[in-house]
Amino acid sequence: MAKQPEDWLNDYPAEEEEEEIIWVSKSEIKRDAEALKKLGTELVELSKSALERVPLDEDLLAAIELAQKIKREGRRRQLQFIGKLLRTRDVEPITIALDKLKNRHNQQITLLHKLEELRDKLIDGNDDVIDEVVALFPQTDRQQLRTLIRNAKKEKAANKPPKSYRQIFQYLKDMAESA
């Protein structure tokens, strides 16, 4: 008896799990490689103390330290090599650590701006602002803060240099750091 077309399919063993083939364009591969090379360049530009905060293995760390010593064409080749090393590693923890390093500076600037605004409110405001400062920083000495505010107002009225003005900011900065 002749085999039916349905029987021909049974002659070949069916794969239990078919793997999905993901097609990636050559341009996308190049973009990814370039992004990793830029990440490597950022790592090379970091100081030694900042590099210690980034999770790097020994090979990658050695390659980065070598790239920091090399100049010109050798440096370019070393950056290519660092990009190659990064392709074989999980770069997510590295990028997270770099973002934290970059954002730390932005967070400090934001904090300083908030403290400046608070200082200006203290000098222009009333006791409600002092209560707000005490709520933010419980270790604040009200009497010392009031004295600084009073002195700053006197200096401003007499057109003297803003010594107490700066002291209020420094006091608030110290309170923020100790909180």
UniProtKB/Swiss-Prot annotation:
GO biological process, one term: assembly of large subunit precursor of preribosome
Keywords, ordered alphabetically: Cytoplasm, Ribosome biogenesis, RNA-binding, rRNA-binding
Keyword Magnesium among UniProt keywords: no
GO molecular function: ribosome binding; rRNA binding
Membrane is among the record's keywords: no
Listed Gene3D superfamilies: PSPTO4464-like domains
Compartment(s) where it occurs, according to its Swiss-Prot or TrEMBL record: Cytoplasm
Spans traversing the lipid bilayer: none
CC per GO annotation: cytosol
Main location: cytoplasm
Protein family according to the UniProt entry: Belongs to the DarP family.
Role, per record: Member of a network of 50S ribosomal subunit biogenesis factors which assembles along the 30S-50S interface, preventing incorrect 23S rRNA structures from forming. Promotes peptidyl transferase center (PTC) maturation.
Protein name (database record): Dual-action ribosomal maturation protein DarP
Annotated source species: Photorhabdus laumondii subsp. laumondii (strain DSM 15139 / CIP 105565 / TT01) (Photorhabdus luminescens subsp. laumondii)
